[in-house]
A protein has these predicted regions:
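Short, solvent-exposed loop/beta-turn-alpha elements that line the ligand-binding surface or hinge
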Residues: 478-491, 572-594, 654-663, 799
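C-terminal capping/gating helix-and-loop segments adjacent to ligand/active sites or protein-protein/ligand interfaces
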Residues: 666, 729-814
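Conserved N-terminal structural module of periplasmic/extracytoplasmic solute-binding proteins
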Residues: 22-102, 110-116, 143, 156-158, ...
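A structural signal for short loop-to-beta-strand junctions that line the ligand-binding cleft
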Residues: 210, 226, 446-447, 455-456, ...
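Glycine-centered hinge/linker elements that transmit conformational signals in sensory
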Residues: 579-613, 639, 648-656
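Extracytoplasmic "Venus flytrap"/periplasmic binding protein-like
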Residues: 422-492, 618-621, 626-627, 643-645
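Periplasmic solute-binding protein
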Residues: 468-478, 493-537, 556-579, 666-674, ...
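Extracytoplasmic/periplasmic substrate-recognition and gating elements
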Residues: 642-726
Length: 822
């Protein structure tokens, strides 16, 4: 049956990393010690001094091009799904037209031990017959262990029409012995409740199986998610399907209210389900015979790494912690924090619990040679056996996943130091009716810094870096960059870094960035980057002479929006934090307020308008809008932002400003600083330097610009190069003539129609580089000052106060605030 997938199956292998472990638990007879080290005073001294420690074991498994997924454990043996090159069928004497032309990709079953020994199990599913214009293959979607010693694998045989993109999927459950002998094959025909309707209507349809478990009593349970959209209708379903393990006959179906996180088998033989009620995780026991659930407990955070363990134990990750849940008693115990064990968030998904109570997860690193995998084996260890290390304290507001990985890498590489993190976002209360509580974490961090409680390392992405630098709380990173053998200023985009400097000193890492700017038709805004407030006023006057209802930006942009944004852009023009002075009574600020006054007070959301009347590109072409706000995050964004203008000449002119060009750089991710009080600055630099190196910046390449010039040149080359589509198994997708199909680079919407983007041209790259070279402002925020300006300007906007009186009162209030911050 043909159906269009709303979720492309090309991401099945990658998405599987984010799903929970669906393997069976050790046998019920094994009762390992799986508990947190006791608190002081709760146990004898020899039992108290134990902490969870991680051991990182390289896994030698050649040819893998996918991470280890869907882990399952029996005793101390581990099983995983992966994928890679299973054959090279290059004909003798034939020179391939491209690398990999004759390589054969396929799914792989990996057997491993906690010591890093591994082997590929000798089962290779039969490949679909080759058809011109059709890309086909086989995926392993799920793996579980049967109590009789065999393995169950969920196979998905896919077929994708190269021209139409239409797909066909045929799933089967295959029971295997470890020697590759197929014991049972059960074609699955009854999982999709919406499939026939989707075929009739031609709507978007997808089906996935996020869980598989054997109850050991002749039944298999599958967790099924189904999505259908067509004919103006949207439907989705989450359910458990219980099948007879001999015949594949559907025995029971249980509809669920929320999204499925995992389905696992406990050591006692019972099946357990982890799912969501709204955004709250809940755990329940599954009765496959009756087809019902018994809810046991709930959790507080998004789930990762759900796995069955001995007896009635279920283990799961939530937030940074890993927990054990007694499904019989409903009692939960925290075992450890991943970060405390030097394990990154991205490495806490495919989790297994061994018979002796050790916890195993996986990590992988992509390289030109393929995927390098390692096992992360965690176990309670006597504290006396753990080498003591000096601790560097890091304070952050929202720890980004890539930063978490850098912390993990640093801690693993160091024998003398380790980093411990306090994420102040944990103190935010988004359920409070008081908006101040939403930023309680940031307020707490600022209060502690003022009081002298300064950590060794600080994420200053939401902090006033200039003021902290002026107070002598931060360390200049430039001397460290200059003396670093792998860096030096010649290796970095110093123009961008200089924009982030304060009085010639760089207090923060700037790894990746993008440009915030504006775009207008050249006939309206001119042909040059940058303009003054006077030039803007003239352009707006000319536009309104043609249409008095024309606006500066889109109809949604209000006065408060415009004033806030321009304040962030021009903060340094009006405030000198080092002197504790400001000049909001200047002529330049008066012009800014006059400019902002031209914006509407609010947008009328009840207005009867069409989508075309709201489209900023169409409004600019019709002379109803002067320019639009846009971001340049990659070279292809020139196309994305100009596609709707029909080839009309346009200019990335920027916001009107009295100094420089009215575009600004925005930092991406955590911006790290070394405090002046840090006693181990060389060790702190050993961590911070990672954010300037390729290994970190390459992770975001293509999405935002890097400051490392080697990574930047690589990004520029790839933006102009042709890349090709891959099939779900990793092989190249081919057209009817057997040629590789060019990969999509994204798309832009023009008047509601999707337009595919192409490779960037040399002219587009030169334009981006011209804009970057002309930009010297940085996005700078201060919520307290913003409120002073917004409240002070409101009477002027409402014709209740003159412009001169308005700026006088704003200057008076702002001067007091700025002086207090010195």
């Amino acid at each position: 049956m043909k159906k269009k997938l709303i979720i492309v199956i090309c991401v099945l292998l990658a998405a599987a990393l984010l799903a929970a472990c669906g393997g069976a638990a050790p046998a019920a007879t094994a009762q390992p010690t799986l508990s947190a080290p006791p608190e002081s005073g709760d146990a004898p001294e020899e039992a108290q001094a134990r902490v969870w420690q991680a051991r990182f074991v390289p896994l030698e498994a050649a040819g893998l091009t996918a991470a280890l997924q869907k882990g399952a454990a029996r005793g101390d043996t581990l099983y995983y799904i992966s994928g890679g090159v299973i054959a090279d069928e290059t004909p003798e004497g034939v020179e391939p037209d491209w690398p990999e032309q004759y390589w054969v990709y396929g799914p792989i079953l990996v057997k491993a031990s906690p010591e890093g020994e591994s082997e590929v199990l000798p089962y290779t599913p039969e490949r679909p017959e080759s058809e011109p214009g059709v890309n086909s293959g086989v995926l392993f979607e799920q793996l579980c262990l049967d109590p009789d010693g065999s393995l169950w694998v969920l196979e998905n045989r896919y077929r994708i029409d190269a021209e139409s993109g239409e797909s066909r999927e045929e799933r089967s459950l295959v029971k295997l012995r470890e020697d590759g002998e197929v014991l049972t094959r059960l074609p699955l025909q009854t999982l999709g409740a919406f499939a026939e309707e989707a075929e009739r209507s031609g709507g978007s349809y997808s089906l996935s199986v996020p869980g598989l478990a054997s109850d050991g009593k002749g039944a298999l349970c599958l967790a099924v998610h189904e999505y259908y959209a067509g004919g103006g209708n949207y439907r989705q379903s989450n359910r458990l399907c219980v099948l007879d393990a001999e015949s594949g006959e559907l025995k029971n179906t249980l509809e669920l209210d929320g999204e499925i996180a995992a389905l696992v088998r406990l050591g006692s033989g019972q099946l357990a389900l982890a799912s969501y009620r709204g955004s709250s995780p809940v755990f329940a026991l599954v009765d496959t015979e009756k087809g019902d659930l018994t809810e046991v407990a709930a959790a507080d955070d998004f789930l990762t790494g759900v796995v069955g363990a001995a007896g009635d134990t279920l283990c799961y990750g939530a937030g940074d912690g890993f927990y054990r849940l007694d499904m019989a008693a409903g009692e939960t115990e925290k075992l450890f924090d991943w970060a405390a064990c030097d394990v990154a968030h991205s490495e806490s998904d495919s989790v297994c619990v061994l018979e002796d109570g050790r916890v195993v997860t996986t990590a992988c690193r992509e390289s030109a040679e393929g995927v390098r995998s390692e096992l992360v084996v965690l176990a309670p260890t006597a504290a006396s056996e753990v080498a003591e290390r000096k601790v560097l304290q890091l304070a952050v507001m929202n720890l980004y996943p890539f930063t978490s990985e850098m912390i993990s890498r640093f801690n693993r590489s160091q024998s003398e130091y380790r980093i411990e993190v306090t994420d102040y976002a944990q103190f935010n209360d988004y359920t409070s009716a008081d908006p101040a509580d939403w930023n309680a974490g940031l307020t707490r961090l600022q209060t502690e810094l003022i009081a002298g409680k300064v950590p060794d390392l600080i994420d200053i992405s939401l902090l006033p870096v200039s003021r902290l630098g002026e107070k002598g709380l931060l360390t200049d990173l430039l001397p460290y960059i200059d003396s670093d053998p792998e860096l030096g200023r010649e290796k970095l985009n110093m123009h961008v870094l200089e924009a982030f400097e304060q009085q010639g000193k760089l207090y923060q890492t700037v790894s990746n960035y993008y440009v915030m700017t504006t775009l207008g038709l050249s006939g309206a805004v001119g042909e040059h980057i940058g303009w003054s407030m006077g030039e803007f006023s003239g352009a707006m006057r000319r536009l309104q002479e043609q249409d008095s209802a024309s606006t500066v930006f889109d109809v949604y942009t209000t006065r408060d929006d415009a004033l806030t944004f321009l304040l962030y852009l021009q903060m340094e023009d009006y405030v000198d934090w080092s002197e504790g002075s400001c000049r909001f009574d200047s002529e330049a600020f008066k012009q800014l307020l006059s400019f902002v006054r031209s914006f509407p007070t609010a947008y009328d959301w009840g207005a009867d308008v069409t989508a075309a009347e709201l489209d900023p590109d169409l409004r600019m072409l019709a002379g109803q809008q002067l320019m639009k706000q846009c971001n340049l995050t990659c070279f292809e964004d020139v196309q994305a932002n100009t596609a709707g203008l029909g080839g009309a000449p346009c200019t990335f002119v920027g916001y009107p400003t009295e100094s420089g060009v009215g575009s600004m750089f925005a930092q991406v991710g955590n911006a790290l600083a070394i405090s002046a009080a840090c006693p181990e600055k060389e060790a702190a630099w050993a961590f911070v330097r990672q954010f300037f190196l390729p290994a970190y910046q390459e992770q975001l390449m293509g999405g935002v610009f890097p400051t490392n010039l080697a990574v930047y040149e690589q990004m520029k080359t790839e933006a102009q190069s042709t890349s090709y589509q891959r099939n779900p198994d990793g092989s190249y997708a081919l057209d009817a003539e057997g040629q590789r199909i060019e990969a999509e680079r994204g798309s832009a919407y023009v008047a509601g129609t999707e337009v595919k983007l192409r490779a960037a041209t040399a002219e587009e790259i030169a334009l981006v580089e011209e804009i970057v070279a002309a930009t010297d402002h940085v996005l700078s925020t201060d919520d307290s000052l913003k409120e002073i300006l917004l409240s002070g300007a409101a009477p002027y906007f409402a014709d209740q106060r003159s412009l001169d009186e308005t700026v006088r009162q704003i200057q008076s209030r702002a001067a007091i605030y700025v002086s207090e911050q010195k």
